[in-house]
Amino acid sequence: MTKVKKEECEEVPETPSKSYDELLSYLNPVAKPLAGRKLTKKLYKCVKKAIKQKNIRRGVKEVQKFINKGEKGIVVMAGDTLPIEVYCHIPVMCEDRGIPYSYVPSKSDLGAAAGSKRPTCVILIKPHEDYQEAYDECLEDVQALPLPY
């Protein structure tokens, strides 16, 4: 075994991130209400701000546990999660407790916004005074989305 010099190694090009329209082709039939392009961007920014304050719940088990305990916030779910049975009960729980929820197109982008290398399918953003303005803006926009009846 020999060492390979740096000059000889080919650089692996970064995979370009897919556009919003490309991500829409991978959606589940359950992913409604889906956040638009601008709202998706706002939600990702709000998640990034919430991560800095450690004011976030990540993952199906953790989000489900804290929704049952009565914690309030905005639930953001990835629309490309398969199988659907993993998280199809979360919207019903949110509606029963009056918690606004929305879907975004990509679980890998949601995980990246949460500062994780792993994809994340459900996130609960809790309110905090440091990013209250961004949170209120997202809350207003998510509540304005039509419910899928």
Swiss-Prot record:
Gene3D superfamilies: 3.30.1330.30. GO terms for molecular function: box H/ACA snoRNA binding. GO terms for cellular component: box H/ACA snoRNP complex; sno(s)RNA-containing ribonucleoprotein complex; telomerase holoenzyme complex. PROSITE patterns: RIBOSOMAL_L7AE. The keyword Magnesium does not apply. InterPro entries: eL8/uL1-like, H/ACA_rnp_Nhp2-like, Ribosomal_eL30-like_sf, Ribosomal_eL8-like_CS, Ribosomal_eL8/eL30/eS12/Gad45, Ribosomal_eL8/Nhp2. Keywords: Nucleus, Ribonucleoprotein, Ribosome biogenesis, RNA-binding, rRNA processing. It is found in: Nucleus, Nucleolus. GO terms for biological process: rRNA pseudouridine synthesis; snRNA pseudouridine synthesis; telomere maintenance via telomerase. It holds the Pfam family Ribosomal_L7Ae. The keyword RNA-binding applies. Component of the small nucleolar ribonucleoprotein particle containing H/ACA-type snoRNAs (H/ACA snoRNPs). Component of the telomerase holoenzyme complex. Required for ribosome biogenesis. Part of a complex which catalyzes pseudouridylation of rRNA. This involves the isomerization of uridine such that the ribose is subsequently attached to C5, instead of the normal N1. Pseudouridine ('psi') residues may serve to stabilize the conformation of rRNAs. Belongs to the eukaryotic ribosomal protein eL8 family. This is H/ACA ribonucleoprotein complex subunit 2-like protein. It comes from Xenopus laevis (African clawed frog). The gene is nhp2.
